[in-house]
């Protein structure tokens, strides 16, 4: 009997269970996410909206399988069972920008009970440019601004933007054999980043992107008007040349862009602080004690990124926030 109840768990079932609770007890809203990594992210979001009347419980879609991803959340017999007591939370990937071209895109964009990131994935939020300096401070305990992260990510986005439009265009055409997501990411990667001259790696990327653009524009000259129309459409959806990094594959932005610049910056900030400790120490024992204390206070930058919530100030996040507020308004 318990097994059948689990298999048939739905928004209506949870609603019925809520009604059996004492009047002052808070109602539970189950929020299914794609993987373990998503649990903390969505918990930090829903915590801002909970009150004395209800709370969210963030869960994986199955306790019998390690299956991950959007398909597991939406297609594992959950779609028809979602409602005011059960919601799904997914990374948008390209589905937000595909605007209903695929069945998954339609389901994500049209369902009132599916919350999407709008940014490609949670990693994009974790790499929100305006929060990167603070992340470095938390990781190194050094507030020296070595790099203008906002300017760097803006320039990166401006370079990637025209090729990004083509990448989504190929997805809409369902022609990934010619220009896949992997192909696109290979052109907008960063090579070794210099803390003193971070723009150099962007210049190398700019050269790769422009060469590929010339090739695509020549091969698909009939699509140029459609490409220009997509730029206008994307502007309406919130995608601009300045924030394109928020809509590029999240893992790529984290590993091949943000970490490429954050790692050398954090290393430099730590060395700077260590040199300061060495300079101010009156003797070797004090130096060793202070250095040990400092090292114990350090945090890996990738861990800091996963915990920071500076992205909540981003315009892209405001779209998700609006969806949650409208959902809560409907169920009250």
Annotated model-derived regions:
Residues 1-332:
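Acidic, divalent-metal-binding catalytic cores of TOPRIM
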């Amino acid at each position: 009997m318990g097994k059948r109840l689990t298999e048939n768990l739905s928004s209506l079932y949870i609603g019925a269970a809520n009604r059996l609770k004492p009047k002052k007890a808070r109602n539970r809203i189950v929020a299914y996410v794609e993987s373990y990594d998503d649990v903390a992210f969505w918990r930090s979001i829903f915590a801002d909206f909970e009150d004395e009347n209800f709370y969210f419980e963030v869960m994986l879609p199955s306790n019998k399988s390690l299956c991950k991803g959007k398909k597991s959340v939406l297609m594992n017999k959950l779609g028809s069972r979602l409602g005011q007591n059960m919601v799904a939370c997914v990374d948008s990937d390209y589905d937000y920008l595909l605007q209903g071209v695929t069945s998954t895109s339609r389901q994500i964009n049209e369902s009132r009970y599916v919350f999407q990131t709008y940014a490609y994935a949670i990693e994009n939020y974790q790499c929100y440019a305006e929060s990167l300096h603070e992340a470095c401070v938390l990781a190194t305990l050094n507030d020296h601004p070595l790099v203008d992260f906002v300017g760097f990510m803006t320039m990166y986005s401006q370079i990637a933007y025209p090729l990004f439009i083509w990448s989504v265009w190929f997805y809409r055409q369902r022609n990934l054999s010619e220009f896949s997501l992997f192909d696109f990411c290979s052109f907008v990667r960063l090579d070794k980043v210099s803390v003193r001259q971070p723009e150099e790696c962007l210049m190398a990327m700019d050269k790769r992107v422009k060469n590929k653009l010339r090739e695509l524009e020549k091969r698909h000259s009939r699509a140029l008007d459609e490409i220009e129309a997509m730029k206008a459409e994307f502007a309406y959806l919130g995608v601009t040349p300045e924030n394109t990094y928020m809509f590029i594959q999240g893992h790529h932005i984290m590993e091949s862009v943000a970490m490429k610049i954050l790692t050398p910056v954090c290393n430099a900030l730590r060395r700077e602080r260590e040199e300061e400790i060495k300079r101010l120490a009156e003797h070797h024992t004090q130096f060793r004690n202070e250095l040990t204390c400092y090292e114990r206070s350090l945090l890996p930058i990738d861990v800091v990124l996963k915990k920071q919530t500076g992205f909540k100030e981003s315009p892209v996040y405001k779209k998700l926030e609006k969806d949650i507020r409208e959902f809560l308004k409907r169920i009250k």
